[in-house]
Amino acid sequence: MSTKNKKAAGGNGGAPKQTRQQSHDSQDYSSFKTVLFYCMLIVFLPVLTFFVLKGFVLDQFLDISEVKVNIASAVGAVVALHIALGLYIYRAYFGTTGSKASKTD
């Protein structure tokens, strides 16, 4: 009878649920940070690559026409985009092998 009263009063029954919820929240936050980082990388890396190649590398050091500079910068941006996507896919496929999700009832 006393064990029923302890469970009904919420004695120790709430602590495991709370730590489990904090664990899930921590995993969700970690996943959010990872996805946000790769989204920013996928958006900003090609743009930065285009303008760095165009403004600082190709215009300054090579004597080629503006159209060829733009084409070379665009190719560099596409390569940077593919590298960022490849890193994201690699991380998604091979990244978190240590923490397997286990079902608890």
Curated annotation (Swiss-Prot):
GO process terms (BP): vacuolar proton-transporting V-type ATPase complex assembly
GO CC annotation, single: endoplasmic reticulum-Golgi intermediate compartment membrane
A Pfam short name: VMA21
Side Lumenal, residues: 58-68
Sequence ranges on the Cytoplasmic membrane side: 1-36, 90-105
Transmembrane segments: 37-57, 69-89
Membrane topology: Multi-pass membrane protein
Location of the protein in the cell: Endoplasmic reticulum membrane; Endoplasmic reticulum-Golgi intermediate compartment membrane; Cytoplasmic vesicle, COPII-coated vesicle membrane
Keyword set, alphabetical order: Cytoplasmic vesicle, Endoplasmic reticulum, Membrane, Transmembrane, Transmembrane helix
Cited function: Required for the assembly of the V0 complex of the vacuolar ATPase (V-ATPase) in the endoplasmic reticulum.
Family according to the record: Belongs to the VMA21 family.
Name of the protein in its database record: Vacuolar ATPase assembly integral membrane protein VMA21 homolog
Organism: Drosophila erecta
